[in-house]
From Swiss-Prot:
InterPro entries: ExoRNase_PH_dom1 (IPR001247), ExoRNase_PH_dom2 (IPR015847), ExoRNase_PH_dom2_sf (IPR036345), KH_dom (IPR004087), KH_dom_type_1 (IPR004088), KH_dom_type_1_sf (IPR036612), NA-bd_OB-fold (IPR012340), PNPase (IPR012162). It comes from Streptococcus pyogenes serotype M6 (strain ATCC BAA-946 / MGAS10394). Mg(2+) binds at D489, D495. Keywords: Cytoplasm, Magnesium, Metal-binding, Nucleotidyltransferase, RNA-binding, Transferase. PANTHER family: POLYRIBONUCLEOTIDE NUCLEOTIDYLTRANSFERASE (PTHR11252), POLYRIBONUCLEOTIDE NUCLEOTIDYLTRANSFERASE 1, MITOCHONDRIAL (PTHR11252:SF0). One of its GO terms (biological process) is mRNA catabolic process. This is Polyribonucleotide nucleotidyltransferase. GO terms for cellular component: cytosol. Involved in mRNA degradation. Catalyzes the phosphorolysis of single-stranded polyribonucleotides processively in the 3'- to 5'-direction. Its main location: cytoplasm. The lineage of its organism: Bacteria, Bacillati, Bacillota, Bacilli, Lactobacillales.
Length: 710
């Protein structure tokens, strides 16, 4: 295929798509130019079905530092593992694409997005999402798209599609919404306590804007799209399925209805193992035993899936016996740990999260150096999910994509209520340790984080709580579930997480397994989530109603002073010599910003006070008319140099020592002598003149003797 170019304009930026020039060995490839951001997307598919029991889709988003005209950091000067932002963007693209493949599709699919040039006012992630959908759509990969995504901002009551950097900084909303022509299938958002009505309108505005991008993709597919490949879908043997269902469906149904998680898992596993043992023995000599046993496992999964959904939609019974809109039992505890700066333990049923607060000087902020201009990140929320939380063994290592994503969601939810830097000049880190999990652990971490912040004395604007909503839909009828547990998440159609305060929503995240959901479902889910959020806030506020007035004794205390900008170099000294000396003497930590704000951190108030004295002395300036108790440091023929304070000396001219004539300075003064002086002049170069005699009453002039005349 020769190069073909397609052009349109979207949200104020040119959108140019090039096909047929690069990456021609991939199943599908595009170059998307949005503004001055350029993203190459290549999609490939394996020739055979993978052996696993899931769809092996991998989406990558690669940030090449040359795209922003930067050298990579580190010794190797080469891009390493993906940044957190790159990982989150890859997840953002994966989530709306994944539901658009057929049930039973098991071929491995890999979509790679490489940012080749970067324009901070034209979203590279949105260009990558567009390119991912288009590369799949024009390829022979059986993708049931297209999909597209946009960012939505909210400024002065107006919604803005794909806001630029300046607009996003002023926006009360940072929403990414994606979907197909028919419906929304992915949401990711942070918001400054916006109402459910505004959030719903933002979602609908975003979906409306998506239509233009989907229509553009359809035009391109009509010109360059390939015929879709015929691939084998995972299908079980119908006779085998009928046999297993007839024999064991009643037993599995009974096991699924056991209310307690571990007991239910044991009951269902016992039925499954019994079935597997029977069929493994029956077909032991069959050469297709592996395929048969794969089908047996899949059939049992489908039976459990069907029973969970039937219970909810027909009997209105949930696996643990709750009502459709009922929250599991709640418990909130503060001060779970000694010594730390704050801690909160939040439990919802069999999901439990422990959040630990750490406060630090602003010098501990994380420096983010990606494609965007370097910036400092003051608030960090980290989420850890050990395997013991679900009673299993597993790998331990660096945080995976899921943990990074859940941490980022909690970060968005909580950062909306943090005090400003001026109100609270600390770097803030929260770590959520999931101790038990049966669904909605990310929302438990938000609730635990609120407890830890308030227990630690961080003056947040309001407590935040989170809840996860679910959905069971057969295409015609649907049921929205409040506070989904693990089984409902696994076999359900939606995981819609909503976090916020009593005033409004601070974060949203939605993933679905079906093609999309309607505005009616969104509205109902948001309304149920609000009711649940208020119930959780009642429990949190009953434990701790407001942030404590003081920090924990172990937290670093802080004091700030303001110095002139031109005095910053005086405090720092050559090569940091002066500030290092102060830190060594007092044991404090010191941060100085470009505006002359000096923050001093220590758990010892006396050390803070001593540091303030030292810095005040360093930046102190002599003033005309002020009196100083000085020390003579040098004597010259023309006068004496005295030290007023720290590194500020003044000259007392010989004529300013006394009202009477001074012949030799050394006859009157000696080095080391303490004297009181008054500053009488400071010249344009900062040189100070002082006087001793100005502090001494001027003696009266001698009276003239009258001449006697004979």
């Amino acid at each position: 295929m020769s190069k073909q170019t397609f052009t349109t304009t979207f949200a104020g930026n040119p959108l140019v798509v090039e096909v047929g020039q690069v990456a021609k060995q991939a199943n599908g490839a595009t170059v998307v130019r949005y503004g001055e951001s350029t993203v190459l997307t290549a999609a490939v598919m394996s020739k055979k079905m993978a052996t696993g029991d899931f769809f092996p889709l991998q989406v990558n988003y690669e940030e090449k530092m040359y795209a922003a005209g930067k050298f990579p950091g580190g010794f190797m000067k080469r891009e390493g593992r993906p940044s957190t932002d790159a990982t989150l963007t890859a997840r953002l693209i994966d989530r709306p694409i994944r539901p658009m493949f057929a049930e039973g599709f098991r071929n491995e699919v890999q979509v790679t997005n490489t940012v080749l040039s970067y324009d901070e006012n034209a979203s590279a992630p949105m260009a990558a999402m567009f390119g991912s959908s288009l590369a799949l759509s024009i390829s022979d990969i059986p993708f049931n798209g297209p999909i597209a995504g946009v960012q939505v901002g909210y400024i002065d009551g107006e919604f803005i599609i794909n806001p630029d950097k300046e607009q996003m900084e002023a926006s009360l909303l940072e929403l990414t919404v994606a979907g197909s022509k028919e419906a929304i299938n992915m949401v990711e958002s942070g918001a400054k306590e916006l109402s459910e009505d505004i959030m719903l309108e933002a979602l609908l505005k975003g979906h409306q804007a998506i239509q233009e991008l989907i229509a553009f993709q359809e035009q391109i597919v009509a010109v360059v799209g390939k015929e879709k490949a015929e691939v084998e879908l995972l299908q079980v043997d119908a006779d085998l399925q009928a046999d297993i269902v007839a024999k064991y469906n009643a037993q599995l149904q009974k096991a699924v209805q056991v209310e307690e998680k571990k007991a239910r898992e044991a009951a269902t596993e016992a039925v499954k193992e019994m079935v597997k043992a029977e069929y493994e023995e029956r077909y032991a000599e069959d050469e297709n035993l592996a395929t048969i046993m794969r089908d047996v496992a899949e059939i049992l999964e489908q039976m459990e899936h069907a029973e969970v959904r039937r219970l909810i939609t027909e009997d209105k019974i949930r696996p643990d016996g709750r009502k459709i809109d009922e929250i599991r039992p709640l418990d909130a505890v503060v001060d779970f740990l000694p010594k730390v700066h704050g801690s909160g333990l939040f439990t919802r049923g069999q999901t439990q999260a422990l959040s630990i607060l750490t406060l630090a000087p602003m010098g501990e902020t994380q420096i983010i150096d990606g494609l965007a201009p370097e910036y400092k990140k003051r608030f960090l929320h980290h989420y850890n999910f050990p395997q013991y939380s679900v009673g299993e063994t597993g790998r331990y290592g660096a945080a995976g994509r899921r943990e990074i994503g859940h941490g980022a969601l909690g970060e968005r939810a909580l950062e909306q209520v943090l005090p400003s830097l001026e109100e609270f000049p600390y770097a803030i880190r929260l770590v959520a340790e999931v101790l038990e999990s049966n669904g909605s652990s990310s929302q438990a971490s938000i609730c635990a984080g609120t407890l830890a912040l308030m227990a630690g004395g961080v003056p947040i604007k309001a407590p935040v709580a989170g809840i996860a909503m679910g959905l069971i839909s057969d295409g015609t009828n649907y049921t929205v579930l409040t506070d989904i547990q693990g089984l409902e998440d696994h076999f359900g159609d939606m995981d819609f997480k909503v976090a916020g305060t009593r005033e409004g929503i601070t974060a949203l995240q939605m993933d679905i397994k079906i093609a999309g959901i309607t505005p009616q479902i969104l509205e109902e889910a948001l309304a149920q989530a609000k009711k649940a959020r208020f119930e959780i806030l009642d429990v949190i506020e009953a434990t701790i109603a407001e942030p404590r007035p003081e920090l924990a004794p172990t937290a670093p205390k802080i004091d700030t002073i303001k110095i002139d900008v031109d005095k910053i170099k005086v405090v720092i000294g050559k090569g940091g010599e002066t500030i290092d000396k102060i830190i060594a003497e007092t044991g404090v930590k010191i941060d100085i910003d470009d505006e002359g704000n000096v923050s001093i951190y220590s758990s010892d108030q006396a050390a803070i006070n001593r540091t303030k004295e030292i810095i005040a002395g360093l930046v102190r300036e002599a003033k005309v008319g002020e009196v100083y108790h000085a020390k003579v440091v040098r004597i010259e023929k023309f006068g004496a140099f005295v030290n007023l304070f720290d590194k500020t000396d003044a000259l007392v001219h010989i004529s300013e020592i006394a009202w009477t004539r001074t012949t030799n300075v050394s006859d009157v003064l000696e080095v080391g002598e303490d004297v009181d002086v008054k500053v009488i002049k400071i010249d344009e170069k900062g040189r100070v003149d002082a006087s001793m005699k100005a502090l001494i009453p001027r003696p009266p002039k001698p009276e003239k003797k009258e001449e006697k005349h004979d």
